[in-house]
């Protein structure tokens, strides 16, 4: 499969890129800073681009699917506005390119922890970032989409670089916790879940979440 990975040098995007390559897919890494791509692979093409300035449809045209790990950063400027603009550009560009399949790296903040209560609602104001709010808005945008075969994957409350076990539990809109009350997943196993969904779609036009 030929996959365009937007944000392929990021905290999560880099693992999605590597997992896709390990499975034998052809990957186009669409990044702002090509020098950050240190992996070398004959099936990897690196393209320098700015999602807010370049035409997304031209960047992704000819691929079988788009995986967006786009992020506007954690600080500096209006992160919320920039992230939402980028997400909208990716959604519209994917549609314009004729590609149907779009998978999006989401956040945990929009997961339900109780009826009518999302994880982000339980956080103190100083912990809530523009990026968290923007990923929630991205989900709202996707849920209005009728044309794309989109999937939005929310991680557990805690996601860290650890190990690839190849195992995870799957949920829908509710935060998953283990017997100890912990909600966590490694970046590696998050990438496994993303590629599993791409190869064997189970959540078309849905959000799902993964955790141990």
Regions found by a protein language model. Give the residues of each.
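N-terminal Rossmann NAD(P)H-binding glycine-rich loop of SDR-like oxidoreductase domains
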Residues: 3-23
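Conserved beta-strand positions in the Rossmann-like core of class I SAM-dependent methyltransferases
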Residues: 4, 28, 151
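Conserved catalytic-site region of short-chain dehydrogenase/reductase
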Residues: 75, 109-114, 158-162
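Substrate-positioning beta->alpha
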Residues: 134, 181-195, 206
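Glycine/proline-rich active-site loop of Rossmann-fold NAD(P)-dependent oxidoreductases
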Residues: 145-146, 160-167, 197-206
């Amino acid at each position: 499969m030929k996959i365009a990975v937007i944000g392929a040098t990021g905290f999560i995007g880099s693992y999605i890129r590597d997992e896709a390559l390990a499975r034998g897919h052809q990957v186009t890494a669409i990044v702002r800073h090509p020098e950050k791509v240190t992996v070398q692979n004959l099936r990897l093409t690196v393209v320098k681009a700015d999602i807010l300035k370049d035409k997304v449809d031209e960047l992704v045209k000819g691929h079988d699917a788009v995986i967006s790990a786009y992020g506007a950063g954690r600080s500096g400027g209006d992160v919320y506005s920039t992230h939402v603009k980028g997400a909208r550009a990716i959604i519209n560009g994917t549609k314009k390119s004729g590609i149907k399949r779009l998978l999006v790296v989401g956040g945990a903040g929009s997961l339900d922890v109780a009826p009518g209560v999302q994880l982000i609602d339980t956080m103190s104001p100083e912990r809530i970032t523009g990026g968290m709010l923007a990923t929630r808005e991205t989900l709202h945008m996707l849920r209005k989409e009728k044309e794309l075969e989109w999937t939005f994957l929310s991680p557990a409350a805690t996601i860290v670089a650890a190990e690839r076990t190849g195992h995870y539990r799957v949920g829908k809109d509710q935060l998953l916790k283990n017997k100890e009350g912990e909600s966590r997943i490694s970046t590696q196993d998050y990438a496994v879940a993303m590629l599993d969904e791409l190869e064997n779609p189970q959540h078309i036009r849905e959000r799902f979440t993964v955790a141990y």
